[in-house]
Amino acid sequence: MQTKVMTAKEAINSYVKNGDCLAIGGFVTNRRPYALVREIIRQHIGNLYIEGGPSGGDIDMLIGAGLVTAINTAYISNAAFSMVCRRYGEAVVQHKILNEDYSMDVQTIAYHGAALGLPYVPVKNMLGSDLADKWGISAEERKKHDKLPNQKFILQEDPFTPGSMLCLVPTPKI
């Protein structure tokens, strides 16, 4: 049997390409793939679409290197040093990256739905929230990027409970 063991340089060179959508795991400062992120930066692989739950300094490094086009995250912080990662905060305020924002629980449910092969997941906890109505990537901007879903969510009546609404959230295509 052939070994699959390889260096970070070989792995990134083989599996990460410009314009890829990357899901980066871990929680803020724990279990983050810093060595792989540094290798992405060394190889200058850009135009990345990042999916990350509660994210940390590794994604901030990619943003600082100018390699991120869009990010979908619930939270990004260097917990020991700041409430919000510096480069991420600057990039969002200066409109240098597209920023989609879901709550941590909705994002986790969406990842689970993606793992199950579902195109979307129904949730209730975004109903009436500013996350649903005011925050996120505009419809006009979404049309320019084939890696982004056409809409942040769709409101639909619950087919099992007439009169009750659901928020249909797209799952990431990773």
What is each residue range found by the language model?
Residues 1-174:
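Conserved alpha/beta enzyme-core scaffold
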